[in-house]
Structures are given as C-alpha cells and as structure tokens.
C-alpha cells in the first residue's frame, strides 16, 4: 500500500510539472504575441506620426502612412491628422467710424507636416483651440479698424482679401497652414442697420422727386412747343385766308373729298346733300374759285 501511495505521488508531481510547463509555454506565447502587436503601429491616410522615446525624448523622424515598428514600453507614437479641417470663428469688433460689426470667418487649417515635432512641443495636439481663435480675432480687429462701416459693405472683396493675406502670414508663425479663409457673415448693430435702411429710403424718395420734377419740366416744354406750333399754324392760316379768299373754299373741297371717300368705302348706301359735304355748288363764289384754280 505504501509503495502504491508513493507511485501515485510521483505521478501527481510529474503531471503538475507537465501542466506548469504547458502553462508557461502558453504564457510565453501570449507574451510574445502581445509584444509583437505592441511593437507595431499603423499611420492612416492623411496622418503623420512622430515618436516619443522615454529615454531620449522626442525624435525628429517623421513617420508617413503605413505600418511601422517601435520598441514596446519605451517608444510610443504621437499621430497627427494633417488634413485640412474647417473652423468657424465669430468675432465682434469695431469699424473705423466706431460702429460695432459682427464678423464670421470660415478657416480651412492644417498643421505643417515638416514641423510636427515643434508643434507638439509648443502647442500640443489641440493646436487649433490654442491658436486659431486668438490670431483670427487679432487679425479681424486690425483689418476692420481700417475701414468705415459703409466701406465694409461696398469693399467687401478687398476686406476679405486683406484678412486672408494677413491671417495666412500670421498662422505661419505657428507652423499652421491655412488653405482657405473666407468671410461668411458681416452684420451690424440694429441701430446702424435701421439708419442705413432709412438713408436708402430717403435716397429713393429723392430720386423719385427728381424724376417727377424732370417729367413736369418735359411736359411743360412739350406744351410750350405745341402752343408755339399751333400759334404759328393759326398765323399762317390767317395770312393764307387773308391773301387768298379761295383758300377756305379749297379746304372745304378737300374735306368734302375725304368725307365722300369714307362714305363710298362704307357698305351702307348713304345720300348726302351738297350742304352735308360742306359744299354749295350753286354758290357763285365756288364757281369763281374753281375757275381761278383752272
């Protein structure tokens, strides 16, 4: 019995040793897999990475898109998104004539990939929040202060170009690239807007009054010309009647011819006496006039 117990103990010890070896192998394999996984990192498209070393600090190497290796627990990557991202910034500021202006700005910004190490040391990874609001407000206040409120409306394109140029140059001081800068909003205080509207209404009323005055002058001139023409016509007609008694008879004949032509072209048959045609053929004056015309 004692021998059987000893043999059983030996078998149990051997089995335990075998199980321990198996567990050790599994643990070693798991650690190896974990180590390999931790030694690799991927840089996605549109991103760049820099490496921090626990011993030497930041490395100047720049890691582009793709799969890269590192020393686990000693090195870890810092990945930056270098794609342009939109930022909306609004700033209340004052114009040259001390009018309050609310300006909205849309900025497409991205970090300079060649200076990611310096950006991380000075600004960290939230560089947009640290830089863009301050420099945008600074540039907007400086540019808007050069223009009157009315010039901000009439010269908006020039204002936008000046803001763009100044802001791009200012952002380069922080190694930030601005791909686009555009004014999206330009609003004034309610009091100024009401004053501008009243001024426009007054200008329209003045233009309307000027139009009415010019039209009245033209109508007056037309009446003067018409009256002068009628007076000249009456004068000539009077002289003709005075110098030639048959002139009136001739006008009667022409009027009668016109009436006769109209009546003849009508579908209705109408008979008019000579008196109805303003003619009196039996009149001796008529005969004398016709003889003279012959």
From Swiss-Prot:
GO terms for molecular function: protein homodimerization activity. GO terms for cellular component: cell surface; mitochondrial inner membrane; mitochondrial membrane; mitochondrial prohibitin complex; mitochondrion; plasma membrane. Its main location: mitochondrion. It is a single-pass type II membrane protein. It is found in: Mitochondrion inner membrane. Residues 212-237 form a coiled coil. The chain crosses the membrane at residues 20-42. Keywords: Coiled coil, Membrane, Mitochondrion, Mitochondrion inner membrane, Signal-anchor, Transmembrane, Transmembrane helix. Pfam families: Band_7. It comes from the Eukaryota. One of its GO terms (biological process) is regulation of oxidative phosphorylation. High molecular weight complex that consist of phb-1 and phb-2. PHB proteins are essential during embryonic development and are required for somatic and germline differentiation in the larval gonad. A deficiency in PHB proteins results in altered mitochondrial biogenesis in body wall muscle cells. Required for clearance of paternal mitochondria after embryonic fertilization. Belongs to the prohibitin family. This is Mitochondrial prohibitin complex protein 2. It comes from Caenorhabditis elegans.
């Amino acid at each position: 019995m004692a021998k059987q117990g000893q043999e059983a103990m030996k078998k149990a010890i051997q089995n335990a040793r075998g199980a321990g070896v198996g567990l050790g192998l599994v643990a070693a394999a798991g650690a190896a897999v974990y180590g390999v996984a931790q030694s690799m990192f991927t840089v996605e498209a549109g991103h760049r990475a820099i490496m921090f070393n626990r011993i030497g600090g930041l490395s100047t190497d720049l890691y582009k898109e793709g799969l890269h290796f590192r020393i686990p627990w000693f090195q870890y990557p810092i990945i930056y998104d270098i794609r342009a991202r939109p930022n909306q910034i609004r700033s209340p500021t004052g114009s040259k004539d001390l009018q309050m202006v609310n300006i909205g700005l849309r900025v497409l910004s991205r970090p300079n990939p060649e200076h990611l190490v310096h950006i991380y040391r000075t600004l960290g990874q939230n560089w947009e929040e640290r830089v863009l609001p301050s420099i945008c407000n600074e540039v907007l206040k400086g540019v808007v202060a050069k223009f009157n409120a009315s010039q901000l409306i009439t010269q908006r394109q020039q204002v936008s170009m000046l803001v763009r140029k100044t802001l791009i140059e200012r952002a380069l001081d922080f190694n930030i690239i601005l791909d686009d800068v555009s004014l999206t909003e330009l609003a004034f205080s309610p009091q100024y807007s009401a004053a501008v509207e009243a001024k426009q209404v007054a200008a329209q009323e003045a233009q309307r009054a000027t139009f009415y005055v010019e039209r009245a002058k033209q109508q007056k001139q037309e009446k003067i010309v018409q009256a002068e023409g009628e007076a000249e016509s009456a004068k000539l007609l009077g002289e003709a009647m005075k110098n030639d008694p048959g002139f009136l008879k001739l006008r009667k004949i022409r009027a009668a011819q016109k009436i006769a032509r109209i009546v003849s072209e009508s579908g209705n048959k109408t008979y008019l006496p000579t008196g109805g045609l303003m003619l009196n053929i039996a009149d001796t004056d008529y005969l004398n006039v016709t003889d003279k015309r012959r």
